[in-house]
Each structure stands twice: as C-alpha cells, then as structure tokens.
Design a protein with these regions (language model features):
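Nucleotide-sugar-dependent
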Residues: 34-39, 46-72, 78-90
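Hydrophobic/aromatic beta-strand patches that form the interior of the parallel beta-sheet core
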Residues: 4, 28, 45-47, 79, ...
Length: 154
C-alpha cells in the first residue's frame, strides 16, 4: 500500500524528513484540476485531513470542505482525520459518510480496518448517496430557499 500526498502547501522540513523514512508515503505536490479528477477516480481511499491547531479549529469549526463533496462524488472510501469539533468531521461521522479518526490510536485502528477489508463500503456508499441527494442537491436547496424567502415576504 502506498499513500500519495498531493498538496500545494509547503511542508515543514521536519515533516519532510519524517516522511522520507517511510517508503509507503510519496509527496507528489500540486496537480491541475483535470489531474485531480483522474487521481480521485484511480484511488482506493481518499484521505481528508483537518488541522488540530487551535487557530485552524477556530477558523474551520463551522465550515464544510467542498473537497469532501468532490470526494463523495468520486464514489470512493473517504478516510477523514481531524478534531471532531470541526463541522466537516462531525458531519462525516454523524451521517456515516466516511471512516473518521481524531487521534493517533484511531488512525492506526482505522488504517488496519481499511487494509484488512473490514470497512462496510456498501453502508458508506448508501449513506453518501442519501446525503448528496438530501443535503447537496442543487434543486432541492433552491426550492427550500425559495420557500423560506416566500414565507418571509408574507
């Protein structure tokens, strides 16, 4: 198994050195949006990581990463790592949309579950389909907004 990491962010030297000791990690840098779609389609598991820093948690606590919707649309297993008080992780866990971990022990446990085929992919796929059609469908969202605005104007 190999973890390919695509990122535009500059990695600290210490992190680069730590990664260099692990043969199953490969830093790939950034890619075009067209390449991203191909990479997502070819992947077995898509990994989403939220920062544990207090500042990042404060900044992202109520947001939901659009990258996660892209991951859901790719139809692949999502493995999300980060603090559970961040909306993205909370939503993924509460709606059974991804495998989640919020500490090192959980990361190890979940990686082993993925590796050993112990993940209920049918349940995840069904949950993703339900979530996308219920909460991310453009027509449904527009209809709800129209109804709310109509009520306000009465």
């Amino acid at each position: 198994a190999e973890l390919l990491i695509y990122t535009q962010s500059m990695m600290e030297v210490g992190m680069q050195e730590a990664f260099s000791y692990c043969n199953s990690l490969k830093l790939c840098g950034s890619v075009s949006s067209i390449e991203v779609l191909k990479i997502q389609q070819d992947a077995d598991v898509l990994v989403h990581v939220e920062s544990f820093s207090k500042q990042s948690v404060f900044e992202t606590k109520m947001s939901f990463s659009t990258k996660l919707v892209d991951y859901m649309m790719a139809g692949k297993i999502i493995f999300a790592i980060g603090p559970m008080e961040v909306n993205s992780l909370e939503t993924l866990r509460n709606h059974n949309l991804a495998i989640t971990a919020c500490c090192d022990d959980e990361v190890k446990k979940q990686v082993l579950a993925i590796k050993n085929g112990e993940v209920d992919t049918k349940s995840l796929t069904a949950s993703i389909h339900k979530y996308i059609t219920t909460y991310r469908d453009k027509i449904i969202i527009q209809k709800e907004m129209f109804n709310r605005l109509s009520e306000l104007m009465k």
